[in-house]
Amino acid sequence: MQTKQATVTIDDQEWIVLDTDEAQDKKIFCKLMSLDGTIVWHAWVDINQIVGII
């Protein structure tokens, strides 16, 4: 079982932040995973939307 360290909500769906990369203009490039672990994707996320420790 994976422990949630940080999450972000996009379009009313919660995603686990697996990894982060470069930051630019108050956004950070993140690797995100769905809570059930079936979807993994990359997206630019507003830093202020991330909840938890990254």
Question: Each PLM stretch: what is its role?
Answer:
Residues 1-11:
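Short coil-to-beta transition motif at edge beta-strands of beta-rich domains
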